[in-house]
From Swiss-Prot:
Superkingdom assignment: Bacteria
SUPFAM superfamilies: TolB, N-terminal domain, Tricorn protease N-terminal domain
Listed NCBIfam families: propeller_TolB
UniProt organism field: Burkholderia thailandensis (strain ATCC 700388 / DSM 13276 / CCUG 48851 / CIP 106301 / E264)
UniProt keyword annotation of Disulfide bond present: no
Keywords linked to the UniProt accession: Cell cycle, Cell division, Periplasm, Signal
InterPro entries documented for this protein: 6-blade_b-propeller_TolB-like, PD40, Tol-Pal_TolB, TolB_N
Coiled coil regions, renumbered to chain: none
Complexes and interactors: The Tol-Pal system is composed of five core proteins: the inner membrane proteins TolA, TolQ and TolR, the periplasmic protein TolB and the outer membrane protein Pal. They form a network linking the inner and outer membranes and the peptidoglycan layer.
Protein name: Tol-Pal system protein TolB
A cellular component term, taken from the record's GO annotations: periplasmic space
Similarity comment text for this entry: Belongs to the TolB family.
Length: 433
């Protein structure tokens, strides 16, 4: 490895231990643009009795479907249509809608609301079923209900589970204040899980979606914590000598892989989700970092410079004592930040290309790898729970922003709209239990 390459990789490792630059408060609005000719035309009528609600459910549904890039919203007019009404399939088809949604909202005796809807296929002229959902009469409850309806529509019409009712985590810096934010999948309803005057990096969702592991510098060094979202309780997972970084959950949620400089060069260890049972997994004289479990729990992918330059390797989840690490990436001379798709078929990573850093996706069966972005300062990729999209951090207009792109590269990436701010370290949460 040349001195420049070695210094570059060490700078990369160091950059994992510093936070984003200053910015004003950021509001994320997630938008993923699809290919118009492949978008599914659908009409979602206003639901009966929803006009008086704090948040209209159908506005959330329409926004979700449009944001996915897979649907085109056909104007359904302003007249509410209940799910009990007879459907004139020909009329809706004439409007250009291949599917139609009707529904209603009713108040329950306990003050909650029941939302009923039915999805129709106007081409085959048949019902595709629906749901009856109970929700609280507040903005959060109505938003969640809208996301659930959009998920139902997405799965019924496209055959893939939707990810609208999932959450994002990311880090925002305002001046010298850092916030770990948890938001809906559309970037709305963001709430701080942690606010600190010291950097916060590397948030990672637990498989249950109830916990987030992250690295905080509040003790004047990088320490790995777990934050229990329902209770707000948090606790230390790794505070070993040196740097503690890059937490990654095992699929069963019982173990985390972490990168520690306990003995000098950064190596990969495992630790239980309670912070006990520290076990070393790699034993090289190089830098081993950024671990990530395969969905079946059999492998850990990681970044290492053991071959002379940063590349992605994989080893048995039990460590190199259970089997030698094998190199995975061969396209390009500098590859980092491995993330595996939920079905285990794709590897997303960051590759240095032409002086910049681009998000690549590799087919793990064929080894074919392709850039899926046109940005040049990409970092921190994170797959959606259905594997259809990748969220990542990049630079745009001199600001640190988030972007999303279809994992198959079928459409260009979309920079997320922010209002005066820099945000980094994205992590897309799992399906909600």
């Amino acid at each position: 490895m040349s001195l420049m390459t070695k210094l570059g990789f060490r700078a990369l490792v160091a950059s994992c231990l510093i936070a984003a630059g200053g910015a004003a408060h950021a509001q994320v609005n997630v938008l993923i643009t699809g290919v118009g000719s492949t978008q599914f035309p659908i009409a979602t009528a206003n639901f009966v009795n929803e006009a008086s609600l704090p948040q209209q459910v159908t506005s959330i549904v329409r926004a979700d479907l449009a944001r996915s890039g897979k649907f085109t919203n056909v104007d359904a007019g302003g007249t509410p249509v209940p799910e009990t009404a007879s459907v004139d399939f020909g009329a809706w088809k004439a409007k250009g809608a291949n599917a139609f949604v009707a529904g209603s909202v009713s108040r329950e005796p306990n003050g909650q609301y029941k939302v009923n809807f039915i999805l129709y296929d106007t081409v085959k002229q048949q019902s595709l079923g629906g749901l009856s959902l109970t929700t609280s009469n507040d903005n959060e409850g109505m938003r969640k209900t809208g996301h659930k309806i959009a998920d139902y529509i997405y799965q019924k019409l496209l055959g893939v589970r939707g990810v609208f009712n999932t959450r994002l985590s990311y880090v925002q810096r305002t001046g010298n204040v850092y916030k770990l934010l948890i938001s809906d999948s559309d970037g709305q309803n963001a709430i701080p899980a942690l606010t600190s005057k010291e950097p916060i990096i590397s948030p990672a969702w637990s498989p249950s979606g109830t916990k987030v592991a992250y690295v905080s510098f509040e003790l004047r060094k990088p320490v790995v914590y777990i934050h229990d979202l329902p209770t707000g309780r948090r606790y230390v997972i790794s505070n070993q000598k040196g740097n503690n970084s890059a937490p990654a959950w095992s699929p069963d949620g019982q173990t985390l892989a972490v990168a520690l400089s306990l003995t000098g060069n950064t190596q990969i260890y495992s630790v239980s989700s309670t912070g006990s049972g520290l076990h070393r997994l790699t034993r090289s004289s190089s830098i081993d970092t950024e671990p990530f479990y395969s969905p079946d729990g059999k492998w850990i992918y990681f970044t290492s410079d053991r071959g002379g330059a940063p590349q992605i390797y994989r080893m048995p989840a039990g460590g190199e004592s259970a089997g030698a690490a094998q190199r995975v990436t061969f396209t390009g001379s500098y590859n980092t930040s491995p993330r595996i798709s939920p079905d285990g078929k794709l590897l997303a990573y960051i590759s240095r290309t032409g002086g910049g850093f681009k998000l690549y996706v590799q087919d793990l069966q064929t080894g074919a790898a392709n850039a899926v972005t046109n940005t040049t300062r990409d970092e921190s990729p994170s797959f959606a729970a259905n594997g259809q999209y990748i969220l990542y951090a990049t630079q745009s207009g001199g600001r640190s922003v988030l972007a999303a792109v279809p994992s198959d590269g079928s459409a260009p990436p979309q920079i997320l709209s922010v209002q005066g701010g820099a945000i980094r370290e994205p992590s897309w949460g799992p399906f909600m239990q």
